[in-house]
Amino acid sequence: MLDIKWIRENPELLDQALAKRGAEPLSQSLIALDEQRRAVVQDMQDMQSRRNSASKEIGAAMAQKDMALAEKLKAEVASLKDTLPAAEEDERRLSAELTDALSRIPNIPLDDVPVGADEHDNVVARVVGQKPGWNHTAIEHPEIGEALGYMDFDRAAKLSGARFTVLTGPLARLERALGQFMIDLHTSEHGYTEVSSPLMVRDEAMYGTGQLPKFSEELFKTTDGRWLIPTAEVTLTNLVSGEILDQEKLPLRFTALTPSFRSEAGSAGRDTRGMLRQHQFWKCELVSITDAQSALAEHERMTACAEEVLKRLGLHFRTMTLCTGDMGFGAAKTYDLEVWLPGQNTFREISSCSVCGDFQGRRMNARYRNKDGKGTTFVHTLNGSGTAVGRCLIAVMENYLNEDGSITVPDVLLPYMGGLTRIEKAS
């Protein structure tokens, strides 16, 4: 969430930032709403001040036996008491309207974010590795998995409908191995603390990380009012909501391997085959809670941690700097990691790493005590996939495909595979 004080002082900067994201200017409507609220607050304060002073004057009038004045003052106090509740209700209504309006405004892009309309305007930051050197025909993962006999979309549809997958045998183990490898790497070498947290959260948690109120249609909600997390970013970031941390203890780095749940409401007709876009999928999430001074360096570090997963798997990928029109709602800058999928003959996103400034910290009311002792500051937050497990499984299947249809297990996953070095067709 943005600071209304900053908007009052920098209306042109807000509108310029919104224009970069392809949105309409909002500064004047926000400032007008805030002025209404502030006027009501001033009226309330004036009435409260007059009520207090009139109450004191009643005593003085009574002491001087001026009963007429005392009665007049009593009537004034009574009138003010009757008027104040309506003013207080106006203030609550206007404050709620302003908060709601502010909660729907996206984050301000950093100055070095390329300006653009959509994914076609993203910029390549670096390319790592090479395409597979084999000469046999590339095949997409649904055909590979079904031919092996370990990937079943029909039974998944029978159980749950579209956009679900059933994995069995060694392919299920390979998916599990990928998740274990990621969480082990990030905890043992990258300094992240593993967290096991709920998969269902309250409205406040979804609000804190920016999913609510704007994106409720993309989420799953339980009958008792809780939300299934679309990413562990929600739980890991909200661990510090409402808290005041010590700056000396920052950054806090958390990671979790969890299922994620998304309705894919805006993805009708996109990636309907296979595992690329699922309602339920495993993801290893990275979250950092840091101070304003360290956030940009932490962003580069987090991105490097996600890249290391793909490097150790020997996968060809590129890191993209997202343009203003393709960034997520809460991001100030985002790197996307896109892995090469031979079966599709293209790169596909496998991780997004974003720095959010104090956008989420303000929504969560999470602060840190400045080490110089001068007050508190909203925390800066970062989140990234380290990485999406299902998409990583797809990448391994397509890049480690052998001519006979089997899949070679990447060396880094062998310790997790119980001696299995190759996944072959089910007998």
Curated annotation (Swiss-Prot):
<keyword id="KW-0963">Cytoplasm</keyword>
<dbReference type="Pfam" id="PF00587">
    <property type="entry name" value="tRNA-synt_2b"/>
</dbReference>
<dbReference type="GO" id="GO:0016260">
    <property type="term" value="P:selenocysteine biosynthetic process"/>
</dbReference>
<dbReference type="GO" id="GO:0005737">
    <property type="term" value="C:cytoplasm"/>
</dbReference>
<keyword id="KW-0648">Protein biosynthesis</keyword>
<dbReference type="GO" id="GO:0006434">
    <property type="term" value="P:seryl-tRNA aminoacylation"/>
</dbReference>
<dbReference type="GO" id="GO:0004828">
    <property type="term" value="F:serine-tRNA ligase activity"/>
</dbReference>
<dbReference type="InterPro" id="IPR006195">
    <property type="entry name" value="aa-tRNA-synth_II"/>
</dbReference>
<comment type="function">
    <text>Catalyzes the attachment of serine to tRNA(Ser). Is also able to aminoacylate tRNA(Sec) with serine, to form the misacylated tRNA L-seryl-tRNA(Sec), which will be further converted into selenocysteinyl-tRNA(Sec).</text>
</comment>
<comment type="subunit">
    <text>Homodimer. The tRNA molecule binds across the dimer.</text>
</comment>
<feature type="binding site">
    <location>
        <position position="285"/>
    </location>
    <ligand>
        <name>L-serine</name>
    </ligand>
</feature>
<keyword id="KW-0547">Nucleotide-binding</keyword>
<dbReference type="InterPro" id="IPR015866">
    <property type="entry name" value="Ser-tRNA-synth_1_N"/>
</dbReference>
<feature type="binding site">
    <location>
        <begin position="349"/>
        <end position="352"/>
    </location>
    <ligand>
        <name>ATP</name>
    </ligand>
</feature>
<keyword id="KW-0030">Aminoacyl-tRNA synthetase</keyword>
<dbReference type="InterPro" id="IPR002317">
    <property type="entry name" value="Ser-tRNA-ligase_type_1"/>
</dbReference>
<protein>
    <recommendedName>
        <fullName>Serine--tRNA ligase</fullName>
        <ecNumber>6.1.1.11</ecNumber>
    </recommendedName>
</protein>
<dbReference type="InterPro" id="IPR010978">
    <property type="entry name" value="tRNA-bd_arm"/>
</dbReference>
<feature type="binding site">
    <location>
        <begin position="231"/>
        <end position="233"/>
    </location>
    <ligand>
        <name>L-serine</name>
    </ligand>
</feature>
<dbReference type="GO" id="GO:0005524">
    <property type="term" value="F:ATP binding"/>
</dbReference>
<dbReference type="InterPro" id="IPR042103">
    <property type="entry name" value="SerRS_1_N_sf"/>
</dbReference>
<dbReference type="Pfam" id="PF02403">
    <property type="entry name" value="Seryl_tRNA_N"/>
</dbReference>
<dbReference type="InterPro" id="IPR045864">
    <property type="entry name" value="aa-tRNA-synth_II/BPL/LPL"/>
</dbReference>
<dbReference type="InterPro" id="IPR033729">
    <property type="entry name" value="SerRS_core"/>
</dbReference>
<dbReference type="InterPro" id="IPR002314">
    <property type="entry name" value="aa-tRNA-synt_IIb"/>
</dbReference>
<feature type="binding site">
    <location>
        <position position="385"/>
    </location>
    <ligand>
        <name>L-serine</name>
    </ligand>
</feature>
<comment type="similarity">
    <text>Belongs to the class-II aminoacyl-tRNA synthetase family. Type-1 seryl-tRNA synthetase subfamily.</text>
</comment>
<feature type="binding site">
    <location>
        <begin position="262"/>
        <end position="264"/>
    </location>
    <ligand>
        <name>ATP</name>
    </ligand>
</feature>
<comment type="pathway">
    <text>Aminoacyl-tRNA biosynthesis; selenocysteinyl-tRNA(Sec) biosynthesis; L-seryl-tRNA(Sec) from L-serine and tRNA(Sec): step 1/1.</text>
</comment>
<keyword id="KW-0436">Ligase</keyword>
<keyword id="KW-0067">ATP-binding</keyword>
